[in-house]
Amino acid sequence: MDVRTLLETTLSGLGYELVDFELGHGGLMRVFIDAPAGIALDDCVKVSNHLTRLFTVENIDYDRLEVSSPGLDRPLTREADYARFAGERVRIKTRLPIGERKKFAGTLVGLADGQVELDIDGERVAIPLASIDKARLDPQF
């Protein structure tokens, strides 16, 4: 079982969602989690303790483990995220230019037929999901 599948299965069983994970320099593993009610410090501690034991049993090689929430500007990594966060401001970067631009910011309308739809200053823009390199929430204060 690969690390992503192991994390997704384990976190789901604990009531959390794997947003993303990174394997960094020096054996650092960062795990970003979320839950419908949000994430508190106690959640991070609980998941960290559980994953530490799990990684020992599964012989996963890492030196340091960091568990945290994805933050206010969380990445959108799954198709379900585009429905969950409809109505929110987002920033999207595409792999290749679409209409001479690669960066888009607007209100997320949703996902339909493989197209992410944004409202950018009253204009609807459709971006193929497969073309998206990065997508993040863009909270406005």
From Swiss-Prot:
InterPro entries, sorted: Ribosome_maturation_RimP, RimP_C, RimP_C_sf, RimP_N, RimP_N_sf
Keywords for this protein: Cytoplasm, Ribosome biogenesis
Localization per Swiss-Prot or TrEMBL: Cytoplasm
Record-level GO BP terms: ribosomal small subunit assembly; translation
One GO cellular component, as annotated: cytosol
Location, primary (coarse class): cytoplasm
Annotated NCBIfam families: PRK00092.2-1 (NF000929)
Name of the protein in question: Ribosome maturation factor RimP
